[in-house]
């Protein structure tokens, strides 16, 4: 009786964790579509700040660099998620293999978040000082909307 209950609890916990990881990955893909290189933050920046040609050129280069970096990290995230799925398929309970695969997913997701923030601040540095306040407002507004 106790073993069966413990097993059900373990499986339920594992399924819940897997659903959480999958939801996080879906969120990453929805917010970082590879088909559209410009994020909504990028578009809002163009609407809020009158960029000159030099700023546009600088930001476009930074955007291209970030797109390549983001794709590399997203590839690692997909691979890590695949490892997690394989680990669970081999042994559908919390195990050292599932733990390690979960940590790989977490590392890749954290790397993506960090790279995105570095990119945001690199973009800001590419603006004229008089345009940075408007950029900051757009950034803060976007983050606030995302947290609601």
UniProtKB/Swiss-Prot annotation:
Gene3D superfamilies named among the record's database cross-references: 1.20.120.1490
Entry keyword set: Cadmium, Cadmium resistance, Cobalt, Nickel, Plasmid
Sections of the chain in a coiled coil: none
GO biological process: response to cadmium ion
Domain of life of the organism encoding this protein: Bacteria
Known function: Component of the NCC cation-efflux system that confers resistance to nickel, cobalt and cadmium. May be involved in the regulation of NCC.
Family label: To A.eutrophus CnrR.
Protein name: Nickel-cobalt-cadmium resistance protein NccX
Species assigned in the record: Alcaligenes xylosoxydans xylosoxydans
Lineage: Bacteria, Pseudomonadati, Pseudomonadota, Betaproteobacteria, Burkholderiales
Gene that produces this protein: nccX
């Amino acid at each position: 009786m106790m073993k069966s209950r413990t097993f059900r609890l373990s499986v339920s916990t594992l399924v819940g964790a897997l659903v959480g990881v999958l939801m996080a990955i879906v969120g990453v893909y929805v917010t970082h579509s590879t088909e559209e290189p410009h994020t909504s933050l990028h578009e809002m920046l163009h609407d809020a700040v009158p960029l000159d040609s030099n700023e546009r050129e600088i930001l476009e280069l930074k955007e291209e660099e970030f797109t390549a970096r983001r794709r590399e990290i997203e590839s690692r995230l997909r691979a890590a998620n695949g490892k997690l799925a394989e680990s669970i398929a081999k042994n559908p309970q919390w195990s050292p293999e599932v733990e390690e695969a979960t940590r790989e997913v977490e590392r890749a997701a954290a790397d993506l978040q960090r790279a995105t923030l570095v990119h945001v601040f690199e973009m800001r540095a590419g603006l004229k000082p008089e345009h940075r306040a408007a950029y900051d407002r757009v950034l803060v507004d976007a983050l606030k909307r995302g947290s609601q």
